[in-house]
Amino acid sequence: MRFSQDDEVLIKEAWGLLHQIPNAGGEALARMFSCYPGTKSYFPHFGHDFSANNEKVKHHGKKVVDAIGQGVQHLHDLSSCLHTLSEKHARELMVDPCNFQYLIEAIMTTIAAHYGEKFTPEINCAAEKCLGQIVHVLISLYR
């Protein structure tokens, strides 16, 4: 999928919003764990604390946000940019692909919770489009 110039501007704006939230990734993961408790099974090393304040959740959340940032910087070559991550999740970790959609929901909710009306429908749409493409790349090796 190609992103239009307008999409790219809005995606970068959405990324700017996400990136400004302290511990955005940890907060999004904690939301996902709360809404979809089955996702906790992939993170036994987190112990029993799946809150955004857990240092391990924060650390993994930062990895998630950094990976999204890499995707945003390489919108025209997401496959190459995210190939290693896709390989790891598909072959090594064997993450159920539906979990990526759960994470998208949690990320979008995190941005909306922090920015309200500033997270306009246009930015929301572009962010979903971008995250959807990132997920598409991440699950591409499952076939």
UniProtKB/Swiss-Prot annotation:
Binding positions (heme b): H89
Superkingdom of source: Eukaryota
Annotated GO biological process: hydrogen peroxide catabolic process
InterPro entries cross-referenced by the UniProt entry: Globin, Globin-like_sf, Globin/Proto, Hemoglobin_a-typ, Hemoglobin_oxygen_transport
Database matches in PROSITE patterns: GLOBIN
Every Globin domain range: 2-143
Keywords tagged on the record: Heme, Iron, Metal-binding, Oxygen transport, Transport
Binding residues annotated for O2, in chain numbering: H60
Cellular component, GO annotation: blood microparticle; haptoglobin-hemoglobin complex; hemoglobin complex
Tissue: Red blood cells.
Entry's Gene Ontology molecular function annotations: haptoglobin binding; heme binding; metal ion binding; organic acid binding; oxygen binding; oxygen carrier activity; peroxidase activity
Gene3D superfamilies cross-referenced by the UniProt entry: Globins
Iron listed as a keyword: yes
Similarity comment: family membership: Belongs to the globin family.
Subunit composition and interactions: Heterotetramer of two alpha chains and two beta chains.
Function: Involved in oxygen transport from the lung to the various peripheral tissues.
Protein name: Hemoglobin subunit alpha
High-level lineage: Eukaryota, Metazoa, Chordata, Craniata, Vertebrata
